[in-house]
């Protein structure tokens, strides 16, 4: 029912998977999703107005806290919707086996990227949230090339890169490499240099198993950065030579990398 959709707008996306390979129908679903998310936001705001905080009791002590919780719920709903749409852009075995589905996938990716672009333009904070949550790295080439507003990611990549999670650091470096190819700008080069410096620091402090976990996935990213910014070639070559020396030293001690 409409009331159920207002409570949980993500129900709109719980549809037949074939919808995500049919461009015209997907456009309709996205229009419904956009309206449902807006209606849900409006209903939550109306709820706060209709149910004022009469006395400071329980866990909520101010209207500001209630507003903060509402905004967090809205952000969670919207980011979850975007994550579902991103997952729909993944190539499946069925796509590979049917040429007509590959054409449909390209169309669907274009439609979803256009939708995400509008969302990111209107809510840059949502772009940050989605990328801090992360998504399959094989989609980075799709999002960076298909979403014109992806350059705004350059603003928060240093913060993403500083996270303690190796997974987030790998994602950040990979994201920078694709952005560097797409936007060979001074700002992108500065962020790319920061990535190289961060990797150099991590190389000297990480244990061998975590070093392997970090550097194997980012090797292709470093190649892309070199392609976009040849001036960083010397720094990246130095980093890789240092990595090779450490690996050789560990191998001599019986701690070689696994193939």
Q: Where on the chain are the PLM-derived regions?
A:
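Extended alpha-solenoid scaffolds built from HEAT/ARM-like alpha-helical repeats
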Residues: 1-259
């Amino acid at each position: 029912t409409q009331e159920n959709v207002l409570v949980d707008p993500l129900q709109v996306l719980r549809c037949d998977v074939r919808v995500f390979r049919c461009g015209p129908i997907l456009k309709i679903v996205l229009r419904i999703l956009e309206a449902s998310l807006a209606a849900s936001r409006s209903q939550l705001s109306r709820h706060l107005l209709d149910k004022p905080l009469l006395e400071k009791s329980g866990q909520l002590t101010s209207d500001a806290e209630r507003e903060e919780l509402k905004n967090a719920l809205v952000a969670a709903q919207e980011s979850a919707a975007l994550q579902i749409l991103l997952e729909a852009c993944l190539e499946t075995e069925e796509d590979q086996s049917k040429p007509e589905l590959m054409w449909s996938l390209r169309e669907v990716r274009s439609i979803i990227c256009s939708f995400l672009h509008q969302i990111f333009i209107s809510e840059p904070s949502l772009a940050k949230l989605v990328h801090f949550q992360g998504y399959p790295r094989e989609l980075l080439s799709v999002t960076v090339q298909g979403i014109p507003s992806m350059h705004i990611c350059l603003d928060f990549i240093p913060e993403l890169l500083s996270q303690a999670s190796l997974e987030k650091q790998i994602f950040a470096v990979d994201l920078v490499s694709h952005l560097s190819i797409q936007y060979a700008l001074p700002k992108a080069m500065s962020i790319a240099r920061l990535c190289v410096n961060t990797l150099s620091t991590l190389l000297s402090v990480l244990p061998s198993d975590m070093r392997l976990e970090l550097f194997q996935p980012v090797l292709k990213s470093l190649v892309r950065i070199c392609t976009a910014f040849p001036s960083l070639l010397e720094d990246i070559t130095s980093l890789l030579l240092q990595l090779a020396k450490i690996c050789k030293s560990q191998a001599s001690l019986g701690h070689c990398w696994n193939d």
